[in-house]
Design a protein with these regions (language model features):
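PP2C/PPM-type serine/threonine phosphatase catalytic domain
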Residues: 1-242
Length: 242
């Protein structure tokens, strides 16, 4: 199997800085599908949460660059995923330690998609999302939020994030890849004003056939949600399986 992929992260028109981070990397080895797409959304109520998002982005990129020469000749799929799990937990502890040592609150969500030959693997913390688009739009991550009542109104709060506690709790799942599927990893800035029917129609009409076209679809979606009034940072990774 092969894939086409695009990755974008923008500040948007209202926020003073971009607290999101996104990355997408893939193996250059012939006949090997090994790729990662990751989006981290810094918690807006914490003034310096881009530090946490940057830690995750850099950590995942370093992990991939370390594993790419080894897979599949010198490390199998199970060992590779175990190593990634351990790396994510170490990054979480790094953020938690930074908070304690510097006396500041930072944190971020993390939605990470790993493609390994004929399977996908999800590592997820927080309320960013990963959608799978085939003959419909399906969310394959769970929003880790809690609903509380304040001043007589229901309010949604983030229940889990990278750096919240020293010992990370993380959602994981796996599935089989099918040619024609599209994965969209994104921060809540991408999804809050994006209707499923519009997303489905865009994916079907555009029929991505290159990395450039994948990025063009992301640009289109980001432009659309900004026009719809989105004020948050917006980040996404789009991957089509062929």
């Amino acid at each position: 199997m092969r894939k086409y992929a695009g990755c974008l992260s923008v500040k948007g028109n209202y926020r003073k800085k971009n607290q999101d981070r996104a990355c997408c990397l893939s193996s250059s080895k012939k006949g090997i599908l090994f790729a990662v797409g990751c989006v981290c959304d810094g918690i807006g109520s914490f003034a310096q949460s881009e530090i946490a998002a940057e830690m995750i982005q850099v950590g995942i990129e370093r992990w991939f660059l370390g594993m790419e020469p080894l897979y599949p000749e010198n490390i199998d799929e199970e060992s590779l995923l175990d190593d990634l799990d351990m790396t994510i937990r170490e990054l979480n502890e790094l953020i938690w330690t930074y908070r304690k040592e510097n006396g500041i609150d930072i944190g971020c969500t993390m939605s990470l998609l790993v493609l390994l030959n004929e399977k996908y693997h999800v590592f997820h913390v927080g309320d960013s999302k990963i959608l799978l688009i085939d003959d419909r739009v399906s969310q394959i991550t769970k929003d880790e939020v809690s609903v509380v009542e304040r001043d007589g109104k229901l309010k949604t709060l983030l229940a889990n994030f990278m750096g919240k506690v020293e010992e990370l709790w993380m959602n994981q799942s796996s599935g089989s890849l099918v040619p024609g599927e599209t994965f969209l990893v994104g921060s809540d800035g991408l999804f809050k004003r994006l209707r499923e029917d519009i997303l489905f129609d865009v994916i079907r009409r555009k029929n991505v056939q290159s990395d450039t076209e994948a990025e063009d679809v992301l640009k289109y979606l980001i432009r659309h949600v900004i026009e719809m009034g989105e004020k948050d940072n917006i980040s996404g990774v789009l991957i089509r399986i062929v």
